[in-house]
């Protein structure tokens, strides 16, 4: 009877998940085609973006294997996968950068070989529970892009968000920097247009100023960067992003970063297990000689 109930629960989840994942939470780079090999340029760096790090247990693994949900397949890795990826990067002499270092080298015009910058969007509880301990174990720096108006909120688009107390614990390790993912503009309309893209100039500036104040108050000075909700931005909104005082913007795109990458369209590679296998492991930067 116990196992029968478990099977019914799992099947129910599989039916629900494909149509309820985060209210259409992510759409950038969410196609079903396998990733292609990254084009290699000698002076470049990899910005690796994560969203969810799942606990590696039977139920989660079962759901992952059988589900057609893009949220699960494209926007999450298991805890064991995440640690395996970090260990692979270390074994291939990746130079892990803080955000501050990443921006410094970009501005300077020269990245160290095998430069890697680890970052996370949304900052839900799975990052604190499953990614943070691994990064702390290996002393790897990371950046979290926070939806500052929803810190600690339960059931935000089906996610339990990380708490302020947990963020401060992470910050005190010296390994974490926190930047804005907007204050309260992480929503999609019915036509898959983000709230940020539809809002007026005054509304956007007010939102980003609130987020900046939160970050400055709790985590000292930020680097004046934003990870766009859903990785989406267009040119007609850039003037207001600049007017709000932001100096860099991050999208989601399967490209390495070069010094010439547009400061407001800096590409980050969305990491899933498949993306790491096809894109990161095959990147020529990890296979060239010093």
From Swiss-Prot:
Top-level taxon in the UniProt lineage: Bacteria
Signal peptide (from-to): 1-28
Pfam families from the UniProt entry: Polysacc_deac_1
Disulfide bond positions: none
Protein's UniProt keywords contain Secreted: yes
Signal keyword on record: yes
Location(s) in or outside the cell: Secreted, Cell wall
Top EC group: hydrolase
PROSITE patterns: NODB
GO biological process: carbohydrate metabolic process
Molecular function terms, GO-annotated: hydrolase activity, acting on carbon-nitrogen (but not peptide) bonds, in linear amides
Record's GO cellular component terms: extracellular region
Occurrences of domain NodB homology (ranges): 114-290
Record EC number: 3.5.1.-
Family: Belongs to the polysaccharide deacetylase family.
Known role: Catalyzes the N-deacetylation of poly-beta-1,6-N-acetyl-D-glucosamine (PNAG, also referred to as PIA), a biofilm adhesin polysaccharide. N-deacetylation is crucial for attachment of the polysaccharide to the bacterial cell surface; it leads to the introduction of positive charges in the otherwise neutral PIA polymer, allowing electrostatic interactions.
Record-linked NCBIfam families: PIA_icaB
Protein name per its UniProtKB record: Poly-beta-1,6-N-acetyl-D-glucosamine N-deacetylase
């Amino acid at each position: 009877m116990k196992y029968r109930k478990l099977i019914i629960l799992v099947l129910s989840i599989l039916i629900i998940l494909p149509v309820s994942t985060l209210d259409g939470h992510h759409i950038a780079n969410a196609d079903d085609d396998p990733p292609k090999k990254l084009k290699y340029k000698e002076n470049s760096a990899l910005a690796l973006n994560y969203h969810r790090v799942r606990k590696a247990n039977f139920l989660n693994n079962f759901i992952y294997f059988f589900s057609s949900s893009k949220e699960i397949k494209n926007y999450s890795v298991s805890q064991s996968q995440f640690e395996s990826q970090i260990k692979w990067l270390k074994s291939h002499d990746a130079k892990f950068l803080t955000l501050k270092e990443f921006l410094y080298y970009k501005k300077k015009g020269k990245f160290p070989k095998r430069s890697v910058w680890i970052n996370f969007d949304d900052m839900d509880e799975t990052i604190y529970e499953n990614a943070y301990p691994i990064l702390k174990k290996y002393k790897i720096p990371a950046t979290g892009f926070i939806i500052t108006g929803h810190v600690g909120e339960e059931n935000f688009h089906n996610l339990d968000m990380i708490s302020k107390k947990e963020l401060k614990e992470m910050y005190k390790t010296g390994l974490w920097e926190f930047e804005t993912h907007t204050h309260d503009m992480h929503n999609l309309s019915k036509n898959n247009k983000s709230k940020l893209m539809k809002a007026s100039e005054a509304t956007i500036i007010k939102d980003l100023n609130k987020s900046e104040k939160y970050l400055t108050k709790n985590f000292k000075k930020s680097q004046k960067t934003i990870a766009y909700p859903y990785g989406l931005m267009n040119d007609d909104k850039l003037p207001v992003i600049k007017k709000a005082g932001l100096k860099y913007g991050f999208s989601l795109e399967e490209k390495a970063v070069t010094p010439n990458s547009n400061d407001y369209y800096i590409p980050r590679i969305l990491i899933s297990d498949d993306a790491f296998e096809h894109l990161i492991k095959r990147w020529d930067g990890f296979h060239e000689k010093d």
